[in-house]
C-alpha cells in the first residue's frame, strides 16, 4: 500500500508539472534586435495609432517586403488582451479585423494587409522573451 501511495503521489506531481504552459511575455527590445538582425526595417508606429501609443510594453512598426505590421507589447497578457479589445472596438467597418489582428502572449500584431506565411514565420520566430 505504501508503494502505491508513493507511486500515485509521484504521478500527481508529474501531472501538475506538465500542466498548460502560461502564455509568454515577449520583450520589445529583444524582438526589435532579432528583426533588425534579419534585415527588417523598423519605424515608430504612426501617430494616428493611439492604441499602439498606449502599449505599456512598447510598440514599433516592422516594414516587411510587401507588408508592414505594428507590434504593440502589453506589460502582461491581460494588458495585451485589452489592446486587442480596443483595436477590435475601433476598427473601420470595411476592415476584416480577424484577418489582420493577431495576439500572441503579450504581443498584439496589427498587419496592414493579410500576412503571408513567410512574414508570419519571420515575425513569430523573432518574438523573444
Model-derived features: where do they sit?
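Positively charged n-region of N-terminal signal peptides that target proteins for export
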Residues: 1-4
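C-terminal motif of bacterial Sec signal peptides marking the signal peptidase cleavage site
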Residues: 14-17
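Bacterial signal peptide processing site
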Residues: 19-21
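Short secondary-structure junctions
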Residues: 36-51, 91, 128-129
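Secretory pathway targeting signatures of secreted, lumenal, and periplasmic proteins
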Residues: 46-68
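An anionic, turn-rich surface loop/hairpin at beta-sheet edges
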Residues: 50-53, 81-99
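A short acidic-to-branched-hydrophobic micro-motif
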Residues: 62-81, 107
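A short, solvent-exposed beta-edge/loop patch
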Residues: 91-129
Amino acid at each position: 500500500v505504501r508503494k502505491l501511495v508513493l507511486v500515485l503521489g509521484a504521478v500527481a506531481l508529474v501531472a501538475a508539472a506538465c500542466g498548460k504552459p502560461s502564455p509568454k511575455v515577449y520583450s520589445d527590445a529583444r524582438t526589435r534586435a532579432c528583426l533588425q538582425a534579419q534585415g527588417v526595417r523598423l519605424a515608430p508606429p504612426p501617430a494616428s495609432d493611439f492604441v499602439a501609443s498606449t502599449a505599456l510594453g512598447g510598440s514599433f512598426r516592422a516594414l516587411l517586403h510587401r507588408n508592414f505590421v505594428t507590434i504593440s507589447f502589453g506589460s502582461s497578457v491581460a494588458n495585451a488582451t485589452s489592446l486587442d479589445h480596443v483595436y477590435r472596438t475601433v476598427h473601420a467597418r470595411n476592415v476584416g479585423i480577424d484577418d489582420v489582428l493577431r495576439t500572441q502572449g503579450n504581443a498584439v500584431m496589427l498587419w496592414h494587409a493579410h500576412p503571408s506565411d513567410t512574414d508570419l514565420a519571420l515575425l513569430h520566430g523573432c518574438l523573444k522573451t
